[in-house]
Amino acid sequence: MNYSTFEISALWHWIERLFVYQADSPLMMGSIPFALLFIFFLAIYTLLKSYSRTAMMMYVICFSLFFAYKVNGMVMWMLPLTACINYAVTQEMRLHEGKARKALLTFVVLVDLALLCYFKYTNFIIGDVVNEMFSTNFSLQSIALPVGISFYTFQAISYAVDTYKRKFDMEVTLLEYCFYLTFFPLLMAGPITRAANLIPRLKRNEQASSRMLWTGLFLIMLGLVKKNMLSDYIAQFNNWVFDAPQTFSGFENLAALFGYPVQIFLDFSGYSDMSIGVAAILGFYLPDNFYFPYRSLSVTEFWRRWHISLSFWFRDYVYIPLGGNRKGKVRMYFNNFLTMLVAGLWHGSSWMFVIWGALHGFGLVVHKFFSRQLGISIPRTLAGNSLSWLITYLYICFAWSFFRVKDLGVLGKMYDKVANDFSIDYLVPFFHARPAWTLCIIGVMLSYLFTERQYHRLQAQFILLPWVAKLLLFIICLQMVVEVSQESVQPFIYYQF
């Protein structure tokens, strides 16, 4: 068979785009290029896992670094640097006691935070803080943010602290530590996984059971539907409104304000489902990151259900070290508020994230004050639960609006439109103009009624299906995703953090 020069050139261009970093189209979990790479990776991984654990770990580390490169370019050098520094210091820390042990912990945590702050907050500190306070005009070249740095930095810190406190006292080799810190399913946006959850299974080198394989496939399907089908579609209208709120009616602005919380939930939980599913296929259990968060009846409950791995991280490594609830009620309220303020800043270098964190901190304090200090709570009846849910959901949606915008000016225009240009008469025309968007929002909100037991039953029923039926459902799911998402694939929102 003869191939033309054009065909060979096109094939080479396709291969180049698959293996070389493309700034205009970074590799994303859930994309077709990632699926092709993962199938190729999985075949070799399965062989190496049976042959040599060391070879398997080296292979996964190399693939993880390649994945980081495809997402972020050469900025991925920060990842192996962080791994080597943290491993060397924590290994030295194991050999010491007392002040020397504490000094080494302090050193490695400060190094981790210094690197995080340099890449993530330098432009913010110089541009938004220093220039505003001192009326200066300093400017810096834009500093490229290593994708996932907030997540793998927190994993590195948790490992160091748990080693210092001997909560995790298992001997770990350099390869095992690099595997833990670079493991690609959780590299870009978590879940933030503790060493005790991952390294023991890595040492056992167990193959994935058939139940894990099918659970992984189920979660990948669920994540694809959430992210590629629903979130990306909902995002199109939301982005139009948030980019130019003055060109839309008050009703449309309000729709976008309520649409964004649905979008970010589908986006982030969809990514988490896919990453947990990929890890399960590789033989590793990762912790759940979402547990029906929009069913919460208080802000306190919301943070037990939303981004669970981050909530627990801040609880264990910020809130409790600050004193938690052990130093009086006033200090407890202050610790809650400060922890959420830091959590807001963790999300990004913007005053909007600080405000978002402050709103959640305020919500936590108010709920704890009324329920614990005053003993006032809404009765746990159907009507009472409905009222608690409505208050909580509206407050969380209000806080999300600050999370989405770049400055208060945009948000002011949106709420001004809602206040002065809102009419229920827009409801029917809006539905006729955007029926699919409206049905997506209604459908997702109705899914809030879905109980945990029903979800686990659905997952169990999928696992019990014949393997042919499972693969057929997966193929149908892929076809639906390709048909719906082929026009516009949105980057994961949490990639920027």
Predicted regions and their residues:
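Membrane-embedded transmembrane alpha-helical bundles that form the catalytic cores
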Residues: N2-Q496
